[in-house]
Amino acid sequence: DLNILIAQSEEGNPDAKFYLGSLYYIGRELKQDYSKALELFKEASERGNIAATFNLGVIYAKGRGVKIDEKKAFEYYKKAAFGGLPQAQYNYAIWLREGRVEDPKPIEAMEWFKVSSNKNFDRSLIELAKGYEDGTAGRRDYREAVKLYRRARANEDNRDNSPYLNSTFYLGKLYLRGLGVAKDEKKGLRFIKEAANGNVNDAIIE
């Protein structure tokens, strides 16, 4: 109930502040208001709600109701990553690898992909698998890559989303080449076709 949520938020409940902020952010049940969302997320974050901290990172990264501020976004992603949120750990790792705010730190980024993968976060599983394919995860290990792609693939309820389709594509390539798994061209092509049908660009090019 919205009234209960508002009352709990006014009493200082960080989770209520986070959920109320989310409603303002997406404009569900309440008129979309990025300023109110920002205020509530800040209050929730200060009271220890890690998801609110992550959302602050998204707001500053995308410029939702504020000027884009990558330095602030990076700090919020970092705080939420250290707070244990897998999505934040993934975003923080991407920004570390790309050198969005600081100099690129690919080794540290890979460690964060590993941490997030331990919580079965699909996009991190894919990045870690790619790291085992190209050796940036510390060693080249195609069998480990296959395992990780399979985990990312199995992790998805909705087969239309990008982590499922991307892991299907990369797994298909390994089946085609017989790397880390018994060579199976039929299966490999089937997987790549499935990814292409889902508009994975690399699969369409392949």
Which residue stretches match the model-derived regions?
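TPR/TPR-like (Sel1-like) alpha-helical repeat modules
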Residues: 186-197
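N-terminal segments that cap or nucleate solenoid repeat domains
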Residues: 1-26
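Canonical positions in the second alpha-helix
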Residues: 8, 43-44, 79-80, 115-116, ...
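Short helix-capping/linker turns of helical repeat alpha-solenoids
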Residues: 10-13, 26-28, 33, 46-49, ...
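Hydrophobic face of amphipathic alpha-helices that form TPR/SEL1-like repeat modules
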Residues: 19-26, 53-62, 91-98, 125-134, ...
